[in-house]
Amino acid sequence: MKEKRRDSKGRILHTGESQRTDGKYLYKYVDAFGNTKYVYAWRLTPTDPTPKGKREKPSLRELEQQIRRDIEDGIDSTGKKMTLCQLYAKQNAQRANVKKSTQKQREQLMRLLKEDKLGARSIDTIKPSDAKEWALRMKDKGFSYNTINNHKRSLKASFYIAIQDDCVRKNPFDFELSEVLENDTKEKVALTEEQEQALLSFIKTDNVYHKYYDDVLILLKTGLRISELCGLTVADIDFKNEVVIIDHQLLKSKEQGYYIETPKTKSGARQVPLSKETIQAFQRVMKKRPKAEPFAIDGRGNFLFVNQKGKPKVAIDYNMLFVRIVKKYNKHHKDNPLPHITPHTLRHTFCTRLASKNMNPKDLQYIMGHSNISITMNWYAHASIDTAKSEVQRLIA
């Protein structure tokens, strides 16, 4: 009978185990894919002391236990050793045909992962506590709650791919961010009817900002996203059917300059009805457009909202415009100032106003271009004490 192998301490070694002349233990095995693999450790059992000068790591028997479990569960021993950066790159490669804005978000997250210690970690070593600590580090870097949540959602999706590919068992990013960070996102507040009228009256009579009256009125009366407004061309206004056709948006970046993209969501492609007042505003915009050289972007031209050089305005132009308008208004109305206003405030106001008038939720969802009815109902449609009172009186009466 062949004598069983023993280590330097006289202990019997199991099948596949051996000890090198330098004292280090080795375990040889065949993984789930038929490949010969090796693992090493300075300790045979968990109770063995770590040799002086060596790093504290799992013992050989602990490694064997994990290996056997992986083989039984069909876990890819090679795949689980890919880094988080490699996993995220793998996910992106599987869905390469995305919008430019999505690609920019991907590039930002990949850059953040490469700069953070978590990006170089093998995915089988990442625990929920590691993912939560990553979220805290992102907050310390100044990223907003929504940005961190979006990135966390992307990494959660990446780990689901790893689970499906039998690389890991659990998803460390499967937790609510609110468990770790306070949601400090400011609630979107609609303008009151009094504030809306005050804003329009001020712009209409101001010697500097009166030329932007129609832009602001159209935003308030259509609820368009600012990128949708900026992308409007002459061909998008259907005066006969009294609708504005939304099938694209205009964006601009430092790297790419101007570019056209499809609407934010599939539901974003829509036709928004126009009131008589809004039709007249569009007619004035067309009439006063500056004469300039034709300017085309991705095959589209004759943009409605352009600067003196004939180039389309973009979101940042309107964001800065509202900062200046509100600043000047509040300078002359210190007792009743306007709140911080952005183009999205006007979209929010439009939606809230229609909801308060009991518009059919599905119709409102269509006009707003929301992908989900819950967005329409829970995110945009804010009740007020006035509408609440009128509803109580209507129902009780």
Regions found by a protein language model. Give the residues of each.
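DNA/chromatin major-groove-contacting recognition/catalytic segments
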Residues: L199, E255-I260, K357, N378, ...
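Short, basic (Lys/Arg/His-rich) helix/loop patches that form interaction surfaces
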Residues: Y145, S201-Y212, V272, K288-F303, ...
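Basic, Lys/Arg- and aromatic-enriched nucleic-acid-binding interface segment
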Residues: N149, Q164, V168-L232, K240, ...
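Conserved tyrosine-mediated DNA breakage-rejoining catalytic core shared by Y-recombinases
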Residues: L232-P290
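Catalytic-site neighborhood detector that most strongly recognizes the C-terminal catalytic loop/helix
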Residues: E182, A190, L250, T349, ...
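Basic/aromatic-enriched alpha-helical hairpins
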Residues: R69-I75, Q86-G142, S158-I161
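Short, Arg/Lys-rich segments that mark the N-terminal edge of DNA/RNA- and chromatin-recognition modules
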Residues: M1-L44, H248
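Short, aromatic/basic-rich helix-turn unit that serves as a nucleic-acid recognition element
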Residues: I12, N35-V39, P46-K52, T83-R111, ...
